């Protein structure tokens, strides 16, 4: 199966500037294509997983993935579909975040000097040295303000009478220049991104055509939500991070294990590398087979992101907790100072400190709603004092929020 054919078959396709021509070119030759990522966190989360899998697919078909870390544009902020002005990051924050993002990506694609090896570039390398007057003189006449004002991302903010700074308005010019720069210096002929980036991508392709006459393309993916309408990558407990220092492999496994029934087939297509025969089996699942399919999906996606050993460990932990009622050492763990437990801490504060609630009021609400357990016993009193008497044989306290979120507290 060719790259574009598989791209469409997996459900990645939304829009392309010239699909027929791009299909023909990618059949004849290998291309370089890029996707940009913001530098706003020290890890990517599953909201970026489709883009990452596309980079992986590119590489598997012998094309060269280029990853752009927006070290330059992160200093401004992309207004695309954002309701508010974005916080501007320091150079130190951007450098730290870029390192974490490369760690996320390295789980899925190979970086190096080979023909199809991925490269990662920071657009600060060329944007930081910009002379503003030179930029206006050399490129300003190629951009139409009339057209920019019609873009949905800008129009939405204007219609809501929300602040749109000139700083942010320049973002689309800089992203267009990124594409031009990569086309000129790295022979990049394709920019990929979410459907919300369509306007920015087309501006870049137009800029290249006007200046150099090169044939380049833009292709976008659909914006994804779960079947219930929730945004991919976010849960009530926070983001589903790819790096294990922010989210344990067990919690990553549990996210996929607990996906909605209606999402199983779609997630298997988008995020796994199951064969077509295996996908066909997913599509014809009987009701009694759904849980087994979810376990298989969670296992494969955890193996892909972390390792086979991490997936096995997560599966074994889940079996011990949910099927055998045991405590497993591989559960996520937080450490509490011994002095705190000796003095005693209220139940609601313990759930908050352990990260099972985002606020103390949320922890109280959890307990009042009969959703909290300590050592598998329901917590009836939010002010109940938890001390060293609650430590089990392994010197841990097991906290549970609902049926599916568990954590061990150690001293």
Swiss-Prot record:
EC number in record: 6.1.1.1
One Gene Ontology cellular component annotation held by this UniProt entry: cytosol
Source organism, top-level taxon: Bacteria
UniProt motif 'KMSKS' region: location: 231-235
Keyword ATP-binding appears in the UniProt entry: yes
Molecular functions (GO terms): ATP binding; RNA binding; tyrosine-tRNA ligase activity
Annotated coiled-coil segments of the chain: none
Motif placement: 'HIGH' region: 39-48
Family annotation (Pfam families): SYY_C-terminal (PF22421), tRNA-synt_1b (PF00579)
Catalytic activity annotation: tRNA(Tyr) + L-tyrosine + ATP = L-tyrosyl-tRNA(Tyr) + AMP + diphosphate + H(+)
Record-listed ATP binding positions: 234
GO-annotated biological processes: tyrosyl-tRNA aminoacylation
Binding site for L-tyrosine: 34, 171, 175
SUPFAM superfamilies: Alpha-L RNA-binding motif, Nucleotidylyl transferase
Positions of the S4 RNA-binding domain: 345-411
Annotated keywords: Aminoacyl-tRNA synthetase, ATP-binding, Cytoplasm, Ligase, Nucleotide-binding, Protein biosynthesis, RNA-binding
UniProt subcellular location: Cytoplasm
Cited CDD domains: S4 (cd00165), TyrRS_core (cd00805)
Complexes and interactors: Homodimer.
Family the UniProt entry places it in: Belongs to the class-I aminoacyl-tRNA synthetase family. TyrS type 1 subfamily.
Function: Catalyzes the attachment of tyrosine to tRNA(Tyr) in a two-step reaction: tyrosine is first activated by ATP to form Tyr-AMP and then transferred to the acceptor end of tRNA(Tyr).
Protein's UniProt name: Tyrosine--tRNA ligase
């Amino acid at each position: 199966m060719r790259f574009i054919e598989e791209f469409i078959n997996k459900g990645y396709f939304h829009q392309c500037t010239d699909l027929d021509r791009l299909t023909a070119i990618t059949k004849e030759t290998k291309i370089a294509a890029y996707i940009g990522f913001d530098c706003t966190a020290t890890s990517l989360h599953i909201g970026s997983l489709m883009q990452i899998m596309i980079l992986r697919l590119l590489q598997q078909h012998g094309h060269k993935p280029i990853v752009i870390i927006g070290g330059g544009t992160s200093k401004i902020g992309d207004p695309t579909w954002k309701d508010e002005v974005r916080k501007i990051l320091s150079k130190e924050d951007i450098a730290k975040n870029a390192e974490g993002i490369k760690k996320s990506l390295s789980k899925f694609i190979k970086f190096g000097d080979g023909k199809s090896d991925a490269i990662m570039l920071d657009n600060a390398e060329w944007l930081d040295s910009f002379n503003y007057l030179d930029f206006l003189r050399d490129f300003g006449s190629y951009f139409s303000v009339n057209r920019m004002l019609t873009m949905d991302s800008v129009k939405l903010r204007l219609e809501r009478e929300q602040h749109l700074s000139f700083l942010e308005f320049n973002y689309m010019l800089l992203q267009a220049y990124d594409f031009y720069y990569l086309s000129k210096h790295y022979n990049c002929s394709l920019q990929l991104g979410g459907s919300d980036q369509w306007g920015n991508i087309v501006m870049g392709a137009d800029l290249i055509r006007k200046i150099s006459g090169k044939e380049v393309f833009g292709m976008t993916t659909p914006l994804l939500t779960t079947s219930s309408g929730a945004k991919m990558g976010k849960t009530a407990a926070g983001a589903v991070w790819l790096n294990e220092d922010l989210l344990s492999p067990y919690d990553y496994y549990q996210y996929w294990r607990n996906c909605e029934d209606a999402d199983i087939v779609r997630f298997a297509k988008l995020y796994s590398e199951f064969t077509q025969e295996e996908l066909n089996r997913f599509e014809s699942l009987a009701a009694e087979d759904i849980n087994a399919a979810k376990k298989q999906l969670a296992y494969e996606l955890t193996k892909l992101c972390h390792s086979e050993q991490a997936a096995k460990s997560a599966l074994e932990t889940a079996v011990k907790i949910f099927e055998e009622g045991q405590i497993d050492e591989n559960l996520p763990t937080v450490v509490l100072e011994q002095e705190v437990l000796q003095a005693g801490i209220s139940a609601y504060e313990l759930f908050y400190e352990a990260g099972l609630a985002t606020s103390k009021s949320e922890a109280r609400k959890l307990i009042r709603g009969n959703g909290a357990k300590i050592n598998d016993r329901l917590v009836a009193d939010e002010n109940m004092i938890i001390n060293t008497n609650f430590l089990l044989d392994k010197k841990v306290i097991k906290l549970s929020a609902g049926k599916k979120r568990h954590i061990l507290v150690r001293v």
